[in-house]
Amino acid sequence: MAKEFLIELGTEELPPTQLRTLAEAFAANFEAELKGAELTHEGVKWYAAPRRLALKVTALAEHQADKIVEKRGPAVSAAFDADGNATKAAQGWARGCGITVDQAERMITDKGEWLLFKQEVKGQPTADIVVELAAKALAGLPIAKPMRWGNKTTQFIRPVKTLTMLMGSDLIQGEILGVASDRVIRGHRFMGEREFTIESAEQYPSILEERGKVMADYEARKAIILADAQKAAAAIGGIADLEDDLVEEVTSLVEWPVVLTAKFEEEFLKVPAEALVYTMKGDQKYFPVYTEDKQLLPNFIFVSNIESKEPRYVIEGNEKVVRPRLADAEFFFNTDRKSKLIDRLPMLENAIFQQQLGTIKDKTDRITELAGYIAEQIGADVEKSKRAGLLAKCDLMTSMVFEFTDTQGVMGMHYARHDGEAEEVAVALNEQYMPRFAGDDLPSNGVSSAVAMADKLDTIVGIFGIGQAPKGSDPFALRRASLGVLRIIVEYGYNLDLVDLVAKAKSLFAQQDGTSRLTNDNVEQEVIEFMLGRFRAWYQDEGFSVDIIQAVLARRPTKPADFDQRVKAVSHFRELEAAEALAAANKRVGNILAKFDGELAADIDLALLREDAEKVLAENVEVMTEALEPAFATGNYQEALSKLADLREPVDAFFDNVMVMADDEALKTNRLTLLNNLRNLFLQIADISLLQK
């Protein structure tokens, strides 16, 4: 027999940004516990609302199945002595099983005969064990900072108020997190019934919706919010900004979603849209509305948690709440524009970037110099890049950015435009932080790219230079910064070398007295290794296999664009018919050469070539060496590897017909030189011996 099973945990308000994670983890943990207990079912569905987590299990078995447990003992040969008496090992095993040796059965396998004990284990009723299973599932939730409440020692993410566990219509007796199970379910705080009883698991969640005015189905609430917000925006001729993270957060904040539209005064549209949007989304959890051409409308959409008979009062209330915040943004914008960005530069002397690395003004000076250096390398406007570097952090000293921190960069752009700075300079102030996250847009031009790379490299080299490389945590976001630099270089194809960039960045930490702010003598090597390590993570995410990435990293290419070409070339080579054989041959060659202690000449001695197979291979290697020079010079590694694939037959013939480690020392050394030259052709691209089958 099987029944519906329900568990609902009623709590105080759960953290909205963690609600989905908690619910999904609860379901996954409980399903794993059911599997471990060998309880069959047809599925587990999770429910989550601001004040509850719930699971409903379809067709959960009411009883564990009976089963036969086998316990194998010692081999018969070890269980009895020469006189046929049971050994101590056999007697001890039998005692542990609660039987005598004579009562043991025998089991014959291809490895011999063994003593065996079979025991029938009766399955337990689900009602007797499900409380413990649920408690274990809850104990395994990802809760960083659990709370205690009252005088209890129990801990959970928020205080627990109610617990309901039903198997069909039967109440499961038990206690979890200090709360005893009963049939009482709490409804909405302001609508429906505050409390009511539930008779069976099948009634959930519909009874909660009907009587308690709580929509427990998270995905259903989210779907309503999305659909109604889109309709509301369309009704005023706009498009709602329904960013998924914000939609998720709002879904986690409401039990009964009611979507409403409000407005604000058009005069606020004179303020940069980013500042208004920051207020609406960040502070108030409102959805901005745009025209089709991305112009902000004087409206916003919000989600109420109550169904009011007079929604206009709810709308007016939200308009009153947001108006002072928008007025603040307007005031800050107007006040900030009374001073030019460049006039705020001296103020950066009073802001510490990092105690050992100096002020933000010190960082600005380094960014300015490094941005100019990079701009020269990539063909961008050097003076504009240096100007953008000089102004890059000035908006940190504005009232707007101080109050609305997420507007840094974008406000710098608006203020720079107001000050009459060149457009490329203004844009660079916003784009210096790009890419902000995986998949984010890159800076749109060379000036922006130069400043963005300079800012990130200064931070990376500086933090590594004072011995604070990231371990587990990464407080300075150096992994993200490194990936940002690599993406800009690779995706724009800039011919930049990390060795040069890091060395230049390091040099800028020199102080007037000739000393450096940096104390780590190995900073250059550590930074380059760290950044090369970011390649592995990035290219794995792009779908390249680990062995391909490692084959290229083995050659330690420090030009990111060059690394990219190598990885793509090796990936293409791997699909060729000859790839597996040549990878194996390279591995064999590497092993042979590793055992040789002597020195090898650069060129082979043609007079010492005796076998036809080695003559053919030598000729092919010589021809290939000359033919591939243009491809290597231009970084056309795919063409080079495609040609090297033609060496499969002469390489196979060589190993089939030539004794490399000949008794004649001269012959042996000459053949090793030939193999070394062969391997070096491949090593100019990657160590293909690392490729797996």
UniProtKB/Swiss-Prot annotation:
UniProt-recorded name of the protein: Glycine--tRNA ligase beta subunit
Subunit structure of this chain's protein: Tetramer of two alpha and two beta subunits.
Keywords recorded for this protein, A-Z: Aminoacyl-tRNA synthetase, ATP-binding, Cytoplasm, Ligase, Nucleotide-binding, Protein biosynthesis
Xref: HAMAP family: Gly_tRNA_synth_beta
InterPro entries: DALR_anticod-bd, Gly-tRNA-synth_bsu, Gly-tRNA-synth_heterodimer
Protein EC: 6.1.1.14
Pfam families in alphabetical order: DALR_1, tRNA_synt_2f
Keyword Hydrolase in annotation: no
Domain of life: Bacteria
Subcellular location: Cytoplasm
GO molecular function, one term: arginine-tRNA ligase activity
Organism: Vibrio vulnificus (strain CMCP6)
GO biological process: arginyl-tRNA aminoacylation; glycyl-tRNA aminoacylation
One GO CC term, this protein: cytosol
Root EC class: ligase
Similarity annotation: Belongs to the class-II aminoacyl-tRNA synthetase family.
